[in-house]
Amino acid sequence: MKFIPHDYQRYCTEYIKTHPVAALFLDMGLGKTVITLTAIQDLMLDTFEVNKVLIIAPLRVARDTWPAEIEKWDHLKNLDISIVVGDVKTRIAAVHHPAMIYVVNRENVKWLVEYYEKNGMRWDFSMVVIDELSSFKNYQSQRFKYLRKVRPFVKRWVGLTGTPSSNGLMDLWAEIGILDGGERLGKFIGRYREAYFKASSMNPANGIVFQYKPKEGAEELIYQRISDITISMKALDYLHMPDCNPTRYEVEMNTEERKLYDMLKQDLLIPLKDGDIDAANAASLTGKLLQMSNGAVNDENGKARVLHDHKLEALEDLIEAANGQSVLVAYWFKHDRQRIINHLTKLKIPVRDIKTSEDIKDWNAGNIPVALIHPASAGHGLNIQQGGHILIWFGLTWSLELYQQTNARLWRQGQTQVVTIHHIITKDTVDEDVMAALEQKDMTQEKLISAVRARLEEK
């Protein structure tokens, strides 16, 4: 297929080529993969500035999306790629297979660095691309530590993500630091924290800080510090996107159900005959309350105890209202998945997970009336927008990143219909807190994106 780039795609490609360190905060659906591959091709085969490239990506994206993009576009036909995924034997063979581009899943970064070290091999990647930069926001993770070890040997770094700082500005220290070696935000997280943040939640007994917030003026200063290597574009700025209609479908507990919910909330315990429901701490309590909001909660023996079916009934109503159109249902807890399957099966409504390539193909062909998806597996590279335009959140997630990525499976470039995103919310429960938290995180994220947004008309 012939690639005819949009202006913003051409601009982003040139940005990568002219910036040894580049962080591209591009919204879902803007074509990060083809943009990056086009830049790689030019750097390797035109200017000869790069001779070997490592791409780090989520497993499915590493295995399927990057090789598929090379195969898809005519102008990339001269690139060859080796996929370093699978068992150890397969990975070793892929490492030694002659290629221009090597793609490894992020879970195997530590293994790859160690393999080079143990075998006395020189780290000879002149360019590293991190597809989903937010995967490296945890500076204590093994993947972060091992990639940082080889950073001095790499002359070009590219970070790709659509959701920078989804949980606040603190994450940026690791994300930007892995690219620029700490040049802009400092080499130590403690100094970064001291310079730009102050405690917002602290245990007065021992002085342990639970949460930080930016100091006055710190946000603008952080944005300014990273602006010379960062480009950001929102999909709505550069694409004709279909309308997106978010809705809330509220359900309500009855008096007895509310009593049990409040008991757990206040006492951290619901005593039951054959297995208590308890919460060890505030974090555990939040999870248990989310489960109760959805209708079932795990007891101390790991058994799901059903509290109510209000969300299942709401789901049934929404599927009926879809009038035969395919519906994508997002769930969070494993036992909710089984409850949904059992409920819809009784109603003789076909339901199926989207996991394999065959599932994706059948969904896009309109052959799956109701598809189930977990937000953690609904990430980048999953193209299912052709199969439907209705998403129902049965159970919510705290993660803005996973929430947005799941929504973007349907609301993205290539979608031809108005997208409707239903949120089934149990009134006066932690469900409402989660929605509020997602909205609050989005405010922080939008500030970041706005602060570093590229304006093509000014270039």
Give the ranges of each region predicted by the language model.
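Regulatory input/activation interfaces that engage signals or partners
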Residues: 330
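SF2 helicase/translocase NTPase motor core
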Residues: 1-143, 149-153, 187-189, 193-214, ...
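Inter-lobe connector of SF1/SF2 helicase motors
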Residues: 228-299
